[in-house]
């Protein structure tokens, strides 16, 4: 995490990853009433530029947007962040800082991408995000990244 924490924000308010593709960015922009599509931000891993936010954040704007658009929100935190501040997010590599089984499967399904296996994940990924309903600590988990959860649990129980 040292490299992540040392990453400069520049003029960004946040550092985060996106888990959507261009088509969904356009659909989300239309749904949220945005002038331009911005990467749809996954808030599972989110770093805040506190000095910039303390200086610039307009909570009335956030509240007004939430009141106006509440009926179209799917994931309210992500919808608000994307719509109001999507242009002020420093995007991080999801394969490194917010890897989920879905992102791994989508990456490996694209022919132009070099396949990524668990050895690659072990060597390069910093944060695994068990997002959605399926969790490795619950029955019926589907995916391959549960191996890291189980290894951690074994280590803790020693």
Give the ranges of each region predicted by the language model.
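GT-A fold catalytic core of metal-dependent nucleotide-sugar glycosyltransferases
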Residues: 1-24, 45-48, 55, 81
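A short secondary-structure junction signal
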Residues: 1-4, 25-30, 56-61, 140
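A short, conserved beta-to-alpha structural element at the edge of catalytic cores
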Residues: 10-34, 139-145
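A glycosyltransferase accessory/donor-loop signature
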Residues: 38, 42-158
């Amino acid at each position: 995490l040292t490299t992540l924490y040392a990453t400069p924000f520049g003029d960004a308010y946040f550092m985060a990853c996106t888990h959507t593709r261009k088509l969904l960015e356009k659909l989300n922009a239309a749904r949220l009433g945005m002038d331009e599509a911005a990467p749809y931000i996954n808030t599972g891993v989110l770093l805040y530029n506190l000095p910039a936010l303390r200086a610039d954040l307009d909570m009335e704007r956030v509240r007004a947007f939430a009141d106006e658009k509440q009926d179209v929100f799917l994931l309210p935190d992500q919808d608000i962040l994307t719509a109001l501040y999507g242009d002020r997010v420093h995007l991080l590599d999801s394969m490194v800082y917010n890897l989920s089984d879905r992102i791994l499967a989508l990456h490996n399904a694209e022919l132009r991408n070099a396949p990524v296996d668990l050895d690659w994940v072990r060597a390069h990924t910093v944060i695994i995000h068990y997002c959605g309903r399926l969790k490795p600590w619950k029955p019926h988990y589907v995916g391959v990244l549960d191996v890291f959860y189980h290894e951690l649990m074994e280590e803790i129980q020693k």
